[in-house]
């Protein structure tokens, strides 16, 4: 590590040095359909200064053409749709193997906190999930809350999935030093989710607050919220709470 000046990765993103602010900026890749800036929001100024994303200036088609021209055996490899280290899509199984712990059954609760059934283990569920619950009800039920500490999963109607505000911790800002005053941004709450207009600010305790113009469906604790100003990543954090609307 001490002998390297730069690390080069294949992420679809760009790094630009802004002379006016004296900061390195993280920008979206030019191929918006492949942009990966969302997963890079926690890079520091020091890391950005020594990182290059050459494919960020290219489309996926152009990358394939270059790979084919240079005889790469994977030039025509289909795009991956899953996490690269979980190729079979069995996320719960991966967590069990990685942690060495098996998931425990627990209580399904309704929105009043009353038990209505038994779940297979919290790692098998995600906010907004409808299929595979094994619960019969006169109306569709969705996962609207997960509490690992209590080993409970809360089920509710579609109206219970919407939140207008969230907070986030482990905040990293890239384009600025602070967000003491509210600023207008485009906020993204998951990798494939369209950015949404919002207002964002940080409180003195370092917590990021985001208020959306319109309620958002299935804001999920533990996921990243990433803020954009056009093509530039302002920063982001790990979602710690969502206020139901």
Regions found by a protein language model. Name each.
Residues 1-233, 237-245:
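Nucleotide-activated chemistry modules centered on ATP-dependent adenylation/adenylyltransferase
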